[in-house]
Amino acid sequence: MEFLETVNRKIVENRTEMLSSLSKLISVPSVAGEGSEEKPFGEEVDRAYRLMLQMGEDAGFSIFDADGYGGHIDYDGTEDGVIGIVGHLDVVPEGDGWDFEPYGGEIADGYVHGRGTMDDKGPVIASFYAMKALKQCGFEPAKTVRLILGLDEETGWKGMQYYLERTPDLPDAGFTPDGDFPVIRAEKGILTFDIIAKFPKSRGKGLELTSLTGGTAHNAVPDFAKAVISDTAGGGYDLIRETVAGCREKYDWDISCRGVGRSLEISVRGKSAHAAKPHQGVNAISILMDFLGRLTFLNDGTSDFVSFYNDRIGFDLHGERIGCAFEDEDSGKLTFNAAMIDVDRNAAKLTVNIRYPVSCSGEQVYAGIMEVLDGYGYGIVKGKQQLPINIDADSHLVSVLMKTYRSHTGDFESEPLVIGGGTYARTFDNVVAFGARFPGEPELGHMKNEKISADNMVRLAQIYAEAVYELAKAED
């Protein structure tokens, strides 16, 4: 269509400006932190949010702010109805080992580098410039096009709930650019919870697990864990050092130890990945617990918890030994991620993130796990549950988005997807994830050296512009 070709050319013209805007947004380290009444998710998240709202105002769009909890940028329509584009501006912690500054926003080698380039600042900027190009080319949408800005997608979604309670009208349909192409029509349910164990007081002398920590986010495979061990009997450290060396050689683990005062610190490095795809990571907590299982601790409670972990969780990714190995034909196997751990002399807390199939319920998952935990005398503290979504592949929304994707890529083989990831799509009735990762591209969100191709930023903006046009235009 001639009009959309004009829009595509405008997006190409805006390329430098678009990349500069993304670089500026990446430079804000918007990890959600301690907040205030005016800045609920901390200074940096609010700074990224205000920067995005200002872009909207400068482009001639109207904006709405729900008291700093979230907001939107509106491309006003001539009729009733809203088409939503739902993104987020918060990011997960950067971690270690980057080749570029994680918040440098550096443009080099054809990429924009930094935390949030793929998840989700890059796609948000591409969506914004899709709207901007349509406006610059004179498009008058029948339905209002709304870019919704979430601020705590990575940490709890309280901001989105607050926003939804205060916005006057919700989208009739839309997409979130926070997943994979071609279209994600269904998402597994999500459970996050803590397994709690209490230890009796130890008596006598021997090895004591003073502390054990690992992981930084419930929705990521932990890439680092460390334990501090004290030896009140004496003579145990040499054996631990020998065991570390043996495991490093036999299993190729990235494990090391060093003296810290009168204690010994054992550190493990794994590989981070999104919790929905634990097979792409290496769980540092599981490696460390496997190692600790080779030692004998003075406190029986400590030893029992280590044994529980290795016997019931270990390196399993699907809950096979802890009572929750559900699966279905539509969405595959449940995934189980031991995400964070905090152990001291008195207690242990293990934070778990599960993605369960669309055909089962969270209650079924909990029932199987609690039956196992009861046998150990351990408790469970339930966190927030996110219910699965399942939109028909033949629906109008999915059909329009599939047609748009195919017209830009020539990919007629890929079909609508079902995933374990949790996006803002599940907070709305008729919203699906639509990009921004193309088939065959590596998964870089939540990982070190996150980046996005400059060419893909242009392609994303063009795809999203056509999708917005088709969904928001007046009916023939």
Question: What is the role of each PLM region?
Answer:
Residues 52, 124-134, 163, 288-291, ...:
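Buried hydrophobic packing segments
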Residues 81-149, 155, 167, 172, ...:
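Active-site metal-coordination/substrate-binding segment of hydrolases
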Residues 108-110, 131-146, 239, 297-303, ...:
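Phosphate-handling active-site elements
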